[in-house]
Amino acid sequence: MSLAPHGGTLINRVNEQYDLTSVQKEIELDLISFADLELIGIGGYSPIEGFFTEKDYVSVVENMRLASGVVWSLPITLPVDSEKAAELAVGDTVKLTYGGETYGVVDIEDIYTPDKQKEAVHVYKTDDAAHPGVKKLFSRGDTYVGGPITLVKKASKQFPEFTFEPADTRRSFEQKGWKTIVGFQTRNPVHRAHEYIQKTALETVDGLFLNPLVGETKSDDIPADVRMESYQVLLDHYYPKDRVFLGVFLAAMRYAGPREAIFHALVRKNYGCTHFIVGRDHAGVGDYYGTYEAQELFDQFTADELGITPMKFEHSFFCQKCGNMGTAKTCPHDKEDHVILSGTKVREMLRSGVMPPAEFSRPEVVEVLIKGLKTKEEAGVS
């Protein structure tokens, strides 16, 4: 049996028979809140039952804990503009819509004005408007609405055969007889360095939960459908089928570095993972965070508080002298012998149709990525 969800109980706020007839007011969600609504409803964000009230918001921003004391590192908020805020009152039940359809309701317990400057500095460690998370934070509404939600309709899925709720993955892991499961978060294609880390972790646990994020990302990130095809090709050719489970993570990317690493681990705990891989600059962007800052943040919490074991890995690479993958812990050779490419450089190569070296990425994966990006470009999709 997999370990307990965060907070002890897997939250279920789904009621598809909810009677909406008397609910008149509505809030139109953006992509971030739309994904958060469903993840709260299905228990992905357990123990959270709704969008944050000011008490939880302030506590998480300042202390990385809910008001109850439970560890939680990112504020899950419902921003609205001042015009919409003026229509709302504490005690209202309000529809949550996206694209004109109702997906949930919120029972408003709090309406408050956040200190976004403080939120940026605490959560993102910067208020630089060039940071994609900070830019998004300041572009959203300046009033936050808090209260428990009910998910009345689930969104149609881009990848239905790879979409699972926490209850589904927990059941699957149990049926497979897996007692220890390591989660791996990614918004990028899986290159040889990631493969090496995953397989090293897989040597010590029963199963790998490859859980790529398919929510909103930066415009220059590889599109989710292209990435999904590349993951399938990689798993088919290079991984033991009975040791890996592929499922998508619906959330938007925050690019909050260390804090987002904690968040990613806690969510995977809810999906049934016992371990979580934390690599270099996890959930980072640009040079805003230290290479191993995310790994260090895990040390601020006790094992009991987190309830999931971080597996910390150094930057890995192919060493031409060793003739295999390694890290600074296992390879004695100089950087000149290491095949290292930045994510930006690889994206440039792929978009130009240039094959990165086989030591960096599996050729089957590269073919899928080049073809997929070319098709997107021809269709006018970035």
UniProtKB/Swiss-Prot annotation:
It catalyses: sulfate + ATP + H(+) = adenosine 5'-phosphosulfate + diphosphate. It holds the Pfam family ATP-sulfurylase. Its EC number is 2.7.7.4. GO terms for molecular function: ATP binding; sulfate adenylyltransferase (ATP) activity. Pathway: Sulfur metabolism; hydrogen sulfide biosynthesis; sulfite from sulfate: step 1/3. The keyword Nucleotide-binding applies. It comes from the Bacteria. The keyword ATP-binding applies. SUPFAM superfamilies: Nucleotidylyl transferase (SSF52374), PUA domain-like (SSF88697). Keywords: ATP-binding, Nucleotide-binding, Nucleotidyltransferase, Transferase. One of its GO terms (biological process) is sulfate assimilation. CDD domains: ATPS (cd00517). Disulfide bonds: none annotated. NCBIfam families: PRK04149.1, sopT. Belongs to the sulfate adenylyltransferase family. HAMAP family: Sulf_adenylyltr. This is Sulfate adenylyltransferase.
